[in-house]
């Protein structure tokens, strides 16, 4: 009788195959979840060979982009794009700020700048439609719209008086054009060398 050279598989060998399949399935599942999450949160980017971190969005821990509560974003997409461009260009944080020199004489509260760095002396404000005309979503009445425009003018004047350059980005600038718009303004103002 000739002995068979094939060996019967033991249950241990079968479990090795099962674990391998589970590992591959788990890795693929994680990859799919990451891709779905990036799509749902509208994150864009490319897979790159090098570890270049200069293109990433960077935020300081003191300035989270979402509130702690319901997870709603507090910054508009225009503000986020302005901040991304500024932090990438200058490599310093540009958080939202309510500096003391922007105290509103009527309310006693400080006005807010969307992206501000006191060391550089630069502030950027992304202005939505409500900054230019009455919008019933943002304003109770036309007087509230006029108050908005008054606060915007007050902010411009107070920044100028305190040596802070304030760049306003209107909502008419497309998100993809915010970077070139800011680059041109910063170059004209001498913040970026020609």
Curated annotation (Swiss-Prot):
One of its GO terms (cellular component) is membrane. It is found in: Membrane. Belongs to the IIV-6 307L family. The chain crosses the membrane at residues 17-37. It comes from Invertebrate iridescent virus 3. This is Uncharacterized protein 033L. The keyword Transmembrane applies. Keywords: Membrane, Transmembrane, Transmembrane helix.
